[in-house]
Amino acid sequence: MIAKPIYMQGEGDGEDGGTNRGTSVITRVKPKTKRPNLYRVLLLNDDYTPMEFVIHILERFFQKDREAATRIMLHVHQHGVGECGVFTYEVAETKVSQVMDFARQHQHPLQCVMEKK
């Protein structure tokens, strides 16, 4: 937290007839906010999920254009894992859940996970 002093002049009998008690300091505390942790959402390669389905997932849930989705899909296919995006915890958790549910509904074994960046 950051303390920022506020100065106030005293009232009372001083040279001008008041009791000048000097200057008071009131400290106002400004809370310092911390940036939220970020999480990478990753797709894992498998031998059964069609490439076109992976592209569809990337377009639908991660708002990737066709070219970017194809590039990520090929990276997943060649390297076994690929990053779909980086999000706060709650958003990453939601994306993983959406992808996993959608894959199960379409009977694909596609795996989607998140890891702290």
Curated annotation (Swiss-Prot):
InterPro entries referenced in this protein's UniProt entry, alphabetically: ClpS, ClpS_core, Ribosomal_bL12_C/ClpS-like
Q: Which domain of life is it from?
A: Bacteria
Q: List cystine links.
A: none
Single GO BP term: proteolysis
User: What Gene3D superfamilies does the record tag this protein with?
Assistant: 3.30.1390.10
Quaternary assembly: Binds to the N-terminal domain of the chaperone ClpA.
Q: Which NCBIfam families match?
A: PRK00033.1-2 (NF000669), PRK00033.1-5 (NF000672)
The similarity annotation says:
Belongs to the ClpS family.
The record describes the protein's role as: Involved in the modulation of the specificity of the ClpAP-mediated ATP-dependent protein degradation.
Q: What is this protein called?
A: ATP-dependent Clp protease adapter protein ClpS 1
Name the species this protein comes from. Answer: Agrobacterium fabrum (strain C58 / ATCC 33970)
